[in-house]
Amino acid sequence: MESGFTSKDTYLSHFNPRDYLEKYYSFGSRHCAENEILRHLLKNLFKIFCLGAVKGELLIDIGSGPTIYQLLSACESFTEIIVSDYTDQNLWELQKWLKKEPGAFDWSPVVTYVCDLEGNRMKGPEKEEKLRRAIKQVLKCDVTQSQPLGGVSLPPADCLLSTLCLDAACPDLPAYRTALRNLGSLLKPGGFLVMVDALKSSYYMIGEQKFSSLPLGWETVRDAVEEAGYTIEQFEVISQNYSSTTSNNEGLFSLVGRKPGRSE
């Protein structure tokens, strides 16, 4: 592993999901870069899942972290969702929300925003319940392994979703390319790959804790996805940076790729 890049053990010991959620997802009227980015991401995911052709039965979310925002529109297009993450504390945080336990993070402002994007077909609490029903499993994952979800037996997915994950999990470009190929093993022929990530970011902060990120430009991302065997159907660059004290990214991207072959 590249010297100085945040290790897996550091994530297990130092990644605080509550601090992360409060820093990046305390969505509200306050004008800040983090809120603006979240709005962009929610709009992009709405377009991909509700206005586009990305639909099916099974979606696997790779590197979910402690968040559910990325799945709010996806649950309109997929009947079964599997969430996954490397760190146990993120999986516990997801379980707290799924089980509506005391102290679970309040996603209601984000959910209300997505309901508004979707034309207010349902109220926030209904949307949250719909997503809870869709999430069938919470699994451990490691994108650096040839079997990212370990030995769990699953049908090939119609869609893989990965938001703000791969650049934090891969210390260098060869590892990034390998991770993309590893993920392909979970996807059925003709299945979709939906990715969202920061561009040219070498770190991000959670409180006083700095976590490494692999700084990639959009051309490098595009080439790596294509070299891993996917056809890119959509690629959008979001020209919004995080706060300077949070990250040194130069925008973000979202893409929709497709694995070769015909889906059943």
Curated annotation (Swiss-Prot):
Induction: Up-regulated in white adipose tissue and liver in response to high-fat diet.
Tissue specificity: Expressed in white adipose tissue and liver (at protein level).
Residues engaged in binding nicotinamide: D197, S213
PROSITE patterns: NNMT_PNMT_TEMT (PS01100), SAM_MT_NNMT_PNMT_TEMT (PS51681)
Keywords: Citrullination, Cytoplasm, Methyltransferase, S-adenosyl-L-methionine, Transferase
GO biological process, one term: positive regulation of protein deacetylation
Pfam hit, one: NNMT_PNMT_TEMT
EC number: 2.1.1.1
Reactions mediated catalytically: nicotinamide + S-adenosyl-L-methionine = 1-methylnicotinamide + S-adenosyl-L-homocysteine
Protein activity control: Inhibited by 6-methoxynicotinamide (JBSNF-000088).
Gene Ontology MF terms: nicotinamide N-methyltransferase activity
Listed pathway(s): Cofactor metabolism; Amino-acid degradation
Record PTM: Deiminated by PADI1 and PADI2.
Chain segments annotated as transmembrane: none
Domain of life, per lineage: Eukaryota
Any one of the GO CC terms: cytosol
Main EC class the enzyme belongs to: transferase
Family (UniProt): Belongs to the class I-like SAM-binding methyltransferase superfamily. NNMT/PNMT/TEMT family.
Subunit structure: Monomer.
Name the UniProt record assigns to this protein: Nicotinamide N-methyltransferase
Organism: Mus musculus
Upper taxonomic lineage: Eukaryota, Metazoa, Chordata, Craniata, Vertebrata
